[in-house]
Amino acid sequence: MTTHPTTAHTPKAAPLPRSRLRAHLVLAGFAAVGLAALTWAAFVQPLPRLIYNPSDSVPGGWYRVEPQRPGADSLSRPLSVGSVVLTTLPPEVAALAAQRGYLPAHVPLLKRVGAVAPQHVCIVAGQVRIDGVPMAAALPADRLGRPLPSWQLCRRLEAGELFLLSVTNPASFDSRYFGPVSASAVIGVAHPVWLETRP
């Protein structure tokens, strides 16, 4: 009996064109959705920022900043007393803050909103009063004995003005020394993410 050698053929998996096409379509769909989401986020709303605050003007820790539209005269949402904003200082105030080491040049700062329009703010004889209620002292000098600007004010805040006032640091450099700031200087509204516990 003659045996004929047989060659074992292992079947090779043939490419499945439909499966590949389907996978490519799904990937292309995800890519298109991702690109559309990025485009929408870039044009419709800026991405939130995460910043760290080491100072005592507001509680120290990490904050998420909801950006303000650039060049807007008023905030997209009205602010209330107690809101924390990331803002720039007027140029002459920023120069003084940098010169004295309160804040590096061109660095925005986090401050609490102490009063908004149409609240009445009065700074007389070293005392800050908001709607007639004493809120803070305006110190004559900083911790190193350097005289602080004596900013006298007794009027209602106008639309688009914010009076920044710390309640956590009596020596904070804020509106009691440089006056109200314009809402157009506000970069965004800060929301605490994680706050430090300090002794």
Q: Where are the language model's segments positioned?
A:
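Short loop segments at secondary-structure junctions
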Residues: 68, 90, 118-120, 168
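Generic structural signal for buried aliphatic residues
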Residues: 82-86, 121, 162-163
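Protein maturation boundaries and topogenic segments
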Residues: 1-108, 156, 176-199
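Short, exposed beta-strand/loop patches in secreted or surface proteins that constitute
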Residues: 54-56, 113, 120-121, 154-155
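Mid-length scaffold segments of soluble, non-membrane domains
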Residues: 104-137
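Non-cytosolic head/periplasmic domains of membrane-anchored proteins
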Residues: 124-195
